[in-house]
């Protein structure tokens, strides 16, 4: 039987674990439930598909460019911080946006800003944890746990709130990820 993960007292590892938890909680809520929010805002299936597809296409180009620039300028932490803030602001604008074009534009900005977060945070984690003689697995574990909690928790929350309010749970997860970096 595998040993239970140890709770780390290393501040870097703790902050990184919190970041992974918040970021993956965001994904755990956003991935399955964002289309329900779009539907609650009156978007039809075709428009929902466009809102989801356009940022995905943009990320194919943006992620390699952003991560390359972060590597070249040795700015992993700064790029993570900027991406978190721009992603948070973008998702906040999504929640306030009126109409499919505004939602699409704001969501594209948010997702392009957030798209390199996993690659950058993994590079940041491996570098920092390696320098401290710490393992990556126990820190990254909290992301997986939070993703599942976001999936299940948002499902329960949707029994108590209207889908139109779900965006604010997504924004809250991003607010929680910012201070953890």
Please report, for each region that a protein language model flagged, where it lies by residue.
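Structural signature of the two symmetry-related core transmembrane helices
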Residues: 78-92, 171
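Transmembrane alpha-helical segments of major facilitator superfamily
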Residues: 51-59, 143, 173
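Residue-level signature of mid-helix packing/kink "hotspots" within the transmembrane helices
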Residues: 56-64, 147-148, 152
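Helix-to-loop junctions at the C-terminal end of transmembrane segments
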Residues: 60-75, 157-159
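Hydrophobic core of transmembrane alpha-helices in multi-pass small-molecule transporters
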Residues: 21, 90-94, 100-120, 124
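Helix-loop boundary and gating motifs at the non-cytosolic
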Residues: 3-56
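Helix-breaking motifs and short loop linkers at transmembrane-helix boundaries and internal kinks
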Residues: 74, 96-101, 180
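Symmetry-related core transmembrane helices of the 12-TM Major Facilitator Superfamily/SLC fold
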Residues: 150, 165-181
């Amino acid at each position: 039987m595998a040993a239970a993960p140890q709770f780390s007292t290393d501040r870097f590892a703790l902050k990184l674990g919190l970041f992974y938890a918040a970021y993956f909680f965001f994904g755990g809520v956003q991935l399955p439930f964002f289309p329900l929010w779009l539907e609650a805002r009156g978007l039809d299936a075709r428009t929902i598909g466009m809102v989801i597809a356009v940022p995905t296409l943009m990320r194919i180009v943006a992620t390699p460019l952003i991560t390359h620039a972060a590597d070249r300028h040795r700015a992993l932490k700064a790029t993570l911080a900027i991406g978190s803030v721009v992603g948070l602001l973008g998702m906040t604008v999504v929640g306030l946006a009126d109409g499919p074009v505004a939602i699409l534009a704001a969501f594209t900005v948010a997702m392009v800003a957030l798209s390199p977060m996993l690659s950058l945070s993994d590079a940041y984690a491996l570098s920092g944890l390696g320098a401290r003689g710490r393992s990556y697995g126990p820190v990254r574990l909290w992301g997986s746990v939070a993703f599942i909690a976001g999936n299940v928790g948002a499902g329960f929350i949707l029994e108590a709130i209207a889908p139109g309010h779900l965006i604010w749970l997504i924004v809250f997860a991003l607010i929680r990820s910012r201070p953890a970096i």
